[in-house]
């Protein structure tokens, strides 16, 4: 299987998000990379499902809560920007204050 660098990045984020989901199910608080991966994966998959940029900007801030993250993680993440493929092309989705 020959994957482009972009496809490898997407696969890595998806795998990290899967690990984060498992940890949340066990009650383990997320660290910085896990929180970023989980929100990023939500945005990429939402774009594939046909959701709009505006919907994903709003919903991306509701994926995880402050209580689901280690102390200080919410303050470390001011914005998350994800390049996602929508039915009409690739767009940049920005989520401001993604962990509330």
From Swiss-Prot:
It catalyses: urea + 2 H2O + H(+) = hydrogencarbonate + 2 NH4(+). GO terms for molecular function: nickel cation binding; urease activity. It is found in: Cytoplasm. One of its GO terms (cellular component) is cytoplasm. The keyword Cytoplasm applies. Keywords: Cytoplasm, Hydrolase. This is Urease subunit gamma. Heterotrimer of UreA (gamma), UreB (beta) and UreC (alpha) subunits. Three heterotrimers associate to form the active enzyme. Its EC number is 3.5.1.5. It comes from Rhodopseudomonas palustris (strain HaA2). GO terms for biological process: urea catabolic process. InterPro entries: Urease_gamma, Urease_gamma/gamma-beta_su, Urease_gamma_sf, Urease_subunit. Pfam families: Urease_gamma (PF00547).
């Amino acid at each position: 299987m020959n994957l482009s660098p972009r496809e490898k990045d997407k696969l890595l984020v998806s795998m990290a998000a899967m690990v984060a989901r498992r940890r949340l199910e066990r009650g383990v608080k997320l660290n910085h990379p896990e929180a970023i991966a989980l929100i990023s994966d939500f945005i990429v998959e939402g774009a594939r499902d046909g959701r709009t940029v505006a919907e994903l900007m709003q919903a991306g801030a509701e994926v995880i809560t402050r209580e689901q993250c280690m102390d200080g993680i919410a303050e470390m993440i001011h914005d998350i920007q994800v390049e996602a493929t929508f039915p009409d092309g690739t767009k940049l989705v920005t989520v401001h204050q993604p962990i509330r």
